[in-house]
Swiss-Prot record:
GO terms for molecular function: phosphatidate phosphatase activity. The chain crosses the membrane at residues 12-32, 66-86, 126-146, 200-217, 223-243, 256-276. GO terms for cellular component: neuron projection; plasma membrane. CDD domains: PAP2_wunen (cd03384). It is found in: Cell membrane; Cell projection, Neuron projection. The keyword Protein transport does not apply. SMART domains: acidPPc. It comes from Danio rerio. This is Phospholipid phosphatase-related protein type 1.
Length: 333
C-alpha cells in the first residue's frame, strides 16, 4: 500500500459511532414520533362555509391511490441506494475512474490492522447522507403539516360539519371553530395534513439527489444522451408524482409546489455543501512551486516603452554594426 495515499486517523471511528450515528438515530426517532404517534398535535384550522376548494370528492384511502404510498416510499429509498452502490463499484472496477477515485480519496488507517478503503468510505458517505436527508425531509414535511393544519381539497366531504347553531348560509362566512366534524376522525385528521405534500417532497428529493450524483460522478465518453435521459426520467417521475396528487384531489397545487421546493432544497444543500458535489474529501492537486512574495510592492503597473527609447536603441544597434564591419580582418590564412 502506497504510503502517500494513506492517512492515519484514530478519531474517525469514534466520531462515526458517537457523533454521526447518534445524530442519525435521533433523526430517525424524531421522524418516527411524527409518523407513528400523536405526540405532536395538529393545528385545528377553520374554514369557510361550503368552500368550493374543500368540496372535492373524497378519493378514498391512500392505499387506493394510483401511486400507493408504500410502493413510493420503497422506491424513493431503494432506487437511489442501488444506483449509488452500483455506480461506486463500477467506477472502482474501471481502471481510469478507479485511479481517479484513489487520487481523490485516501485510505484511512485506524489501527495496526484496520483500514478504510476509499470505496467503502464513499459508499457509506453518499448513502448515509442520502438516508439522513430522506428522514430530514420527512421531518420537515410533518412539521409543516402539524403546524399549519392545512385542509385537503376533500376536507368538507369527510368532515361532514355540524352546522347546527351556526348561521352558515353564505359561502363567505368563516367558521373559526374547525372542530365541528362528525365524520371519521382518522380520515378527518388525515385531511388536515395537506401542506406540504409528502409524496412530492420525498420523490423530488430522491430524484434531485440521484441526478446530482449521476452528473457529478459517472463519466461516459461513448454516449452523450445516456445521463441526460436517465436524469430527466427521474425528475419526470417525481413531477408526475406531484401531478397525480393534484389530479386525485389529495393535495392542492400549492401543496405540491411547496413539496417540490422543500425536497429539492434539501437535496441541493446536502449535495453541494455536505458531500461537496460528490467529490473526494482529500483531493491531491499537483504541487506547485511556492513563490515568496515578501518584499514585492503592493501594486505594479506595466512598463510602456516610449517611441524615443525605441529609436535610440535602434540607432545604437546600427552604430555597433557599422563599427564591427569597418574593422580590418586581422586573421591571416
Amino acid at each position: 500500500m502506497a504510503s502517500d495515499n494513506t492517512h492515519r486517523s484514530y478519531s474517525i471511528i469514534p466520531c462515526f459511532i458517537f457523533v454521526e450515528l447518534v445524530i442519525m438515530a435521533g433523526t430517525v426517532l424524531l421522524a418516527y414520533y411524527f409518523e407513528c404517534t400523536d405526540t405532536f398535535g395538529i393545528h385545528i384550522q377553520g374554514f369557510f362555509c361550503n368552500d368550493a376548494d374543500l368540496l372535492k370528492p373524497y378519493p378514498g384511502p391512500e392505499e387506493s391511490s394510483f401511486i400507493q404510498p408504500l410502493i413510493l416510499y420503497c422506491v424513493v429509498a431503494a432506487a437511489p441506494t442501488a444506483i449509488i452502490f452500483v455506480g461506486e463499484i463500477s467506477m472502482y472496477i474501471m481502471k481510469s475512474t478507479g485511479e481517479a477515485l484513489l487520487a481523490q480519496e485516501k485510505t484511512i488507517v485506524t489501527g495496526e490492522c484496520c483500514y478504510l478503503n476509499p470505496l467503502i468510505r464513499r459508499i457509506i458517505r453518499f448513502i448515509g447522507v442520502f438516508a439522513f436527508g430522506l428522514f430530514a425531509t420527512d421531518i420537515f414535511v410533518n412539521a409543516g403539516q402539524v403546524v399549519t393544519g392545512n385542509l385537503a381539497p376533500y376536507f368538507l366531504n369527510v368532515c361532514k360539519p355540524n352546522y347546527t347553531g351556526l348561521d352558515c348560509h353564505f359561502s363567505h362566512q368563516f367558521i373559526a371553530n374547525g372542530n365541528i366534524c362528525t365524520g371519521n376522525q382518522v380520515v378527518v385528521e388525515r385531511a388536515r395534513r395537506s401542506f406540504p405534500s409528502k409524496d412530492a417532497s420525498l420523490s423530488v428529493y430522491s430524484a434531485v439527489y440521484v441526478t446530482m450524483y449521476i452528473t457529478s460522478t459517472i463519466k461516459t465518453k461513448s454516449s452523450r444522451l445516456a445521463k441526460p435521459v436517465l436524469c430527466l426520467g427521474l425528475l419526470c417521475a417525481a413531477f408526475l408524482t406531484g401531478l397525480n396528487r393534484v389530479s386525485e384531489y389529495r393535495n392542492h397545487c400549492s401543496d405540491v409546489v411547496a413539496g417540490f421546493i422543500l425536497g429539492s432544497s434539501i437535496a441541493l444543500f446536502l449535495g453541494i455543501c455536505v458531500v461537496n458535489n460528490f467529490k473526494g474529501t482529500h483531493s491531491t492537486p499537483t504541487k506547485q512551486k511556492q513563490e515568496d512574495y515578501r518584499g514585492l510592492p503592493l501594486m505594479t503597473f506595466p512598463r510602456v516603452e516610449s517611441p524615443l527609447e525605441t529609436l535610440s536603441a535602434q540607432g545604437k544597434s546600427c552604430q555597433a554594426t557599422l563599427l564591427t564591419s569597418s574593422q580590418p580582418n586581422t586573421w591571416s590564412a
